[in-house]
């Protein structure tokens, strides 16, 4: 761990045994715990806790007041909105030790999770999925899916640029920002050339 390759605010706590990528920024009052892995060019906001053995890919943006618990893996280009929550135990009890029962949650490349959303552990988030603010995710989210509400329900599909996709009668949609085309078949979206 070479401090010259990343920035950590003087109030941030970086435990021994972390791997932090070049160009990453860690802001005020954040705590990076042992054996966590943070990729290159990540931004870790204020008051963030990254627990042991968490893995963040490259260019992950973690906004203020997020706790990322053991068992969470975020692939490249993931966005975690302010005060969103991951759980890592299915049935927590204060008097029952469950440290060996952490449940894995995988957030795939390009997914965005909105402010104050909750992701119940064990529910993977697909590539470029978009979790609306305040949503409570209690089941797997498909790639490119837009989910909202409590419990979260699918409300459409999103482009890789974060725009809602409107599919025509042939199952084709165009992102208004990038011009990229998408195909909807069998309740799955894929980008086409």
Please report, for each region that a protein language model flagged, where it lies by residue.
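Flexible, glycine/small-residue-enriched loop-and-beta-strand segment within the central core
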Residues: 2-10, 16-18, 25-125, 156-158
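Short-chain dehydrogenase/reductase
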Residues: 43, 112, 130, 146-148
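Short, intrinsically disordered, charge-biased short linear motifs at domain edges
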Residues: 143-149, 158-167
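Cys/His-enriched microdomains
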Residues: 154-157, 173
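Short cysteine-rich clusters marking metal-coordination/redox-active sites
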Residues: 159, 175-178
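Short, non-ligating residues that shape and space the ligands of small metal-coordination modules
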Residues: 167-168, 181-186
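Hydrophobic residues embedded in beta-strands of well-ordered beta-sheets
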Residues: 172-173, 188-190
């Amino acid at each position: 761990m070479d401090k010259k390759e990343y920035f950590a605010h003087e109030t941030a706590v970086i435990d021994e045994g972390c791997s932090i990528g070049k160009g990453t920024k860690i802001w005020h009052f954040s705590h990076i715990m042992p054996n966590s892995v943070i990729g290159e060019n990540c931004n870790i906001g204020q008051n963030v806790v990254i627990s042991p053995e968490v893995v963040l890919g490259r260019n992950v943006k973690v906004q203020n007041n997020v706790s990322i618990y053991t068992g969470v893996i975020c692939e490249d280009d993931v966005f975690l909105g302010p005060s969103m929550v991951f759980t890592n135990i299915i049935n927590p009890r204060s008097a029952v030790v469950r440290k060996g029962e952490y449940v894995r949650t995988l957030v795939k490349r390009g997914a965005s999770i909105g402010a104050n959303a909750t992701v119940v552990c064990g529910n993977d988030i697909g590539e470029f999925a978009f979790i609306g603010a305040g949503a409570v995710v209690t089941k797997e989210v498909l790639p490119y899916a837009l989910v909202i509400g409590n419990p979260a329900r699918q409300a459409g599909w999103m482009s890789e640029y974060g725009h809602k996709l409107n599919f025509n009668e042939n199952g084709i949609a165009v992102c208004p920002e990038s011009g990229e085309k998408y195909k909807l078949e069998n309740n799955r979206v894929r980008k086409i050339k």
